[in-house]
Amino acid sequence: MALTFQEILDRIRIIDRDVTELNRLKSRLPADRPYSSSLQISFDKQINELLNERVGLMELEVLDPPSWILGVPTTGISQETPVPLKGLFPSGDLSKEKPDDQDVINFLRELPKTEIHLHLEACVNKDTMKRLMAKNGINVTDEEFEAKFNFKDLNSFIQVFFFIQSLVKEPSDFSFFIESLAEYMRANNILYTEVFFAPSKFIQNGLDFEEMIDFLVNRIREEKENDGIVIRLLVDVSRSFGPENAMKNLDRVLKLRHPEVIGIGLGGAELMGPARDYQGVFQKAREAGLRVVAHSGEDDGPWAIWEAVELLKAERIGHGTSAIQDPELVKYLRENHIPIEICVTSNVFTGKYVRKEQNHPVRYYYDQGLPLSINTDDPEIFNVNLTYEYYKLWRFLDFSLDEIVDLIRQGVFASFHPNKESLWAEMEKNIHLVKTRYGLKR
């Protein structure tokens, strides 16, 4: 879709104004009022929706690029020839003492990134869900549909996943999932991602595991061939269905021969399934050469993380929010180079240990030298994206832009990418170019 330059510019101005005002109101919320957490969530949803819309607008092409715009010549360009909008704007100056928020967001978006804690179902946007519902004859009113996403805690949040999974009726439906994931990666300049795929509910609904994986892998290969983005799968053996089901899922994985499937994860309702119940599953996976990660410390205390690292030998910890309660655990994670997959917005939304970004332990973890990666967890459910996750670190948790670049580097080396050094070397070259455009020292 191509619009006129003025139409797009007017809408972007309104979005920037509204985002600035919402951030101002959010910063003034008192911390000790019963309504504060719900208002913060409301502000976050509005801000994230606006920023996602802005990203979409910048991807559009304009029909009438004016010759005077920022000194960019348009001689020879037909008024009927669409031109990418983002190419018409200069980069902001981030060397200023107080750079503009929107310039920071634009800078962060342009930086190449990786993301390694991401659920496939939660990458499907609502419009795509509705297309899938229409395809499969699923009738849900708009009110019923929106009510599905009004979760109050982690358990009710998991029900959202079950709803999304229920929309899939045949393996080819996963084309909608990979299409949305690839669009999300491109919009945030994510070059490599490790995404969780939870098969249990799909299998209960009558789908065949190998057929699902075959279709997912074929679509993943198509996206890589299209523009080079790399997607790898971690099969979530899941707490939600018990240890016996988890072992069955592992056995299914072990029969595969796809290099795109690199390991397993343990997700689901943390309080329903302590890590010790899955020790045998993880031992068998490790012995088979699979990579192993576990959600832990999201809805339970630091003892749960101890079990994940000591009994499961998890190579990374998803969320790890409660680790801050145990200094010995923080020391152990640092000394054993076990990364924490940080998901700031997700932790605020589920609200067990964190109600405001300012209170998230990521700043403490970074200062303590823990290896970290920054992630969204569930971008379409939380209306967030990876660019804005990094922006929150700058805006609310006092991370400098250089520290954010360091976090991007840490994310690469926390991944299971087979050639981390070469991936980072290529990313670093591009980061230097972006920093130069924005007036920052290399």
Swiss-Prot record:
Stored InterPro entries: A/AMP_deam_AS, A_deaminase_dom, Ado/ade_deaminase, Metal_Hydrolase
Residues that span the membrane, as ranges: none
EC number annotated for this UniProt entry: 3.5.4.46
Listed GO MF terms: cAMP deaminase activity; metal ion binding
PROSITE patterns: A_DEAMINASE
Cofactor: Zn(2+)
Keywords annotated in UniProt: Hydrolase, Metal-binding, Zinc
Disulphide-bonded residues: none
Family: Belongs to the metallo-dependent hydrolases superfamily. Adenosine and AMP deaminases family.
Cross-referenced PANTHER family: ADENINE DEAMINASE
Record function comment: Deaminates cAMP into cIMP, thereby repressing cAMP dependent metabolism or genes.
Name of the protein in question: Cyclic adenylate deaminase
